[in-house]
Structures are given as structure tokens and as C-alpha cells.
Amino acid sequence: MVAGAGLNDRGVVEFVVERAPAAIARLQALGVPFATEGDALHLTREGGHSHRRIVHVADATGWAVQEALLNAARAHPNITLVPDQVAIDLATSRHEERYSGAGHVWGVYAVDRTTGLVDLHTARATVLATGGAGRTYLFSTAPKGATGDGIAMAWRAGCRVSNMEFMQFHPTCLYDLQVKNFLITEAVRGEGGRLVNPTTGKNFMPYYDPRLELAPRDVVARAIDAEIKRYGLDYVHLDISHMPADFVREHFPNIHEKLLGLGIDMTRSPIPVVPAQHYTCGGIVVDRDGRTDLPGLYAAGECTQSGLHGANRLASNSLLECFVFGEAAAAHIARRWDDLPPPPPVRPWDESRVADSDEEVVIKQNWTEIRRFMWNYVGIVRTTKRLERAANRIAMMTEEVADYYGHFRVTPDLIELRNLLQTADLIVRSALHRKESRGLHYTLDHPDMLADAVDTILVPSHF
């Protein structure tokens, strides 16, 4: 509640916390090998937490959970995985052969990466679990597909979107021009790592926050950003070399091995780090059952704004949110299955008036440009003038990409660029709407936090 700066929904926070033990137990049953200490789970501590309460798999928890879930899905007789599909847009009542006006979501149009053809996947219920919009920024720890696809599709279909101004920047991403997006886990600071200015040789966090390296991510990221700008640095140092070497190797085996391959021995030398975009705290408005504004459409995870995180996500709560709301959405669909109407006839994708692209340079140019100006103008520290500059560029590029989209066949790169622009627009509009600094949104023009904590809610005007 403290990290969320007053915007958390207390009921949702309690809802998630109460269901955490069951979610962890289910993951164990699916084969996630959480670290143990004796007969109990080993608990670690990360930024913003007052106690050790985080279960983990060494320093590769996300990978271990992903592998377990994928293996379980592949083995389940009622689950059919359809790989290499890139979603274009939701199929709604507007796409019915006989328009009903019900506003229902009936599935999704997706292009097959292998064939280039557009498929229509229909269903009684559709769940968006598409992740965040990290690739909107030049530097991000997010995977390549994190282009805000679910958020953009839901917005275009008619869903409200909330709190998109709250983009979390992880304080410690490895600074290496050849190896991008390698995250140095928060647990390194939790287990004693110190942030040091390489010019002065001093640990600088005491000058910024009494919680030192364990302050919330927004505080630590702004502190690092301030040191970099004040001293003209490319990076700062994260140093855990004062801890026993065996302790470091045991707690961070994957990071240790990766860094050794890059010529850095973290048991002897500091790690060069910089902040990078890490998590999208805003998204599609959902309730505790994962329901969106549209009948038949559910969402879970980073693409949503559930009320759990507020203005800043507490470390390691993202996976928990996925499990709890994924279960909640599935349970709600199962309970209501007999009441969910089957999909009516839906029109296939129409490519009759488009041609193959002969201007791929447009996509590459805009892709690079948008990520660069979002980093420079809509980053860790903002101003109204920078946000307005970003808004002007987004408007110009949106018109250009819309013209391109209307004349050429869809490709995965074009789909992602279109969604990047849409989510960038939502981020900037939300940031301009908030006339205060709160949590992850820090603006020099409004540095104080207002007394009333109010969500930013954007409502589609095209409906």
C-alpha cells in the first residue's frame, strides 16, 4: 500500500494476498522447484519490502515458472497451443455477419508468421494475457513481443484503460552495449548489494532515501538517474563483492555465470548498471474476476489495471498477479460456461483492397524513432513540454502508419508498430492528465503529490 502511493485498491490487495499461498502451492504441484531452507520455502527480500516474503528459484524464477506452465499446457488434453500467431485485433459484434450491436467479443484475428495468412479464432470467452508495453522504450528489460498488443486491441474494441502514466523503470539493468536487456535482479540489493558512484567511489543512496538500496524501485531509479546526469556518467556500480564469494555464487548462479562470460566477476568487481523500463503498471480496467468492459472479454497480468499495484508495483508481485487473476478469470468462465452464448457467424479478414508492402523502411524508421523519443521525453523524469513534444510526434506518426496500414497487407512488424503507437499515445495522454507527481510518474512541473489519490481513466471516444 505504501509503494502504490495511495492508488491501490485495498480490497484487491487483500484479495490477491489471501490467494497467494494457494497460487504458490499450485505452482509447486506443476513442478516449479522453489528454493527451500530445511522443510520450508526459502524467502528472500527485495526493494520496498519490509520482510523476507518472496519465494524464488535461485535467480531465475520467471524462467522456471514459464517452463513449468508451458510443459503443463503441452501435456493437458484439453489445451491446443497454436504457435506463431500474431494478434491483429479483437473480433467483436462489429465484425458479425449480421451486426447485433451487443458489444460482445467473439475472438481474435491473427496473422500466421509462417504463411502470412490471417486466421480468425472464435470463442465464447477470450482472455488477454499479452503482457505490457515495455518495448515502447529504447531501453527495456521486456521481451521483444512486449509491444502493448492486448492493451491496444482492447482500447480499439472499446475498453477503458487506466493509469498508463505509471511505467516502472527497473533500477539495475546491466550496462553493456552488446548485451541488452539483461536484468540484475532486485535480490542482489536485498542481499547486501550497494549502489556506488564510480567517480566518487561513494555509496549514494543515503543521500536519497533512508531505506537505502531497499527503497521502492521508483526512488532508486530516480536516484541513479540523478547521479548519472549530475556527474555525466554512462552507468553506476552495483557492488556485492564485499559479501563472501560462495554466498554470491550460491544465491545468484545464473547472473554470476552470465557476467563471467562478459568478463565481470561479481564476487570481485562491481557491476555497471543503468535503469531500464521494466513494467507497465496501468492497462485494461478489470474487476476481481478478470472481466473487462466488454462481454466475453477477460484479461489478466501486466496488460491490466486491476487495482493491485497503484502508482508503483512492489517487487515480485507481477507473477503473483498473473496467477491469481488467471485463476479468477478461468473460474468465472467455468461457472458461467452454459450461459455464455456461442459465437455467431463472424466475417473473415478482408484483404481485397491491399497489396504487398514496398516500403518496409517506413516501419523500421518509425519503430526506432518512437522508442527513442519515448525514452527521452516520457522517461523517469518528465516535464509538460517534453510530453507535449511526444504527443505531437505520436499524432504525426499515427496518421502515417494508419495510411500504411490501410494500403498494405499486415505483417507482424506492422502490427507491433501500430500497437506501439497506440500504447505510446495512451501513456502520454495519461501523463499529461496527471497534474502531480505520484509513484512512478514524476514531473518537474508538478513535483508535489496531491491530497486525493485518483486513478487516471481513459474512455474510448470512438464508441
Report the location of each language-model feature.
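Glycine-rich loop(s) and the adjacent beta-strand/alpha-helix scaffold that form part
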Residues: A125-V179, A215, K229-R230, N317-A328
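General beta-strand structural signal in soluble alpha/beta enzymes
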Residues: F34-E37, L81-D84, L120-T122, L128-A129, ...
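Alpha-helix capping and helix-loop boundary segments enriched in small/acidic/polar residues
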Residues: G11, V57-A60, T114, V118, ...
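An anion/pyrophosphate-binding glycine-rich loop and adjacent beta-alpha core
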Residues: M153, C159-I271, H332-D339
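FAD-site-proximal beta/loop scaffold in flavoenzymes
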Residues: D89-T115, L120, I264-L308
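Glycine-rich active-site loop/strand segments that organize a redox cofactor
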Residues: M1-V16
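Glycine- and aromatic-enriched mobile tails/lids
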Residues: R26, V32-R52, V196-E213, I224-E227, ...
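Conserved redox-cofactor binding core of oxidoreductases
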Residues: Q28-L117, T122-R124, A129, C173-D176
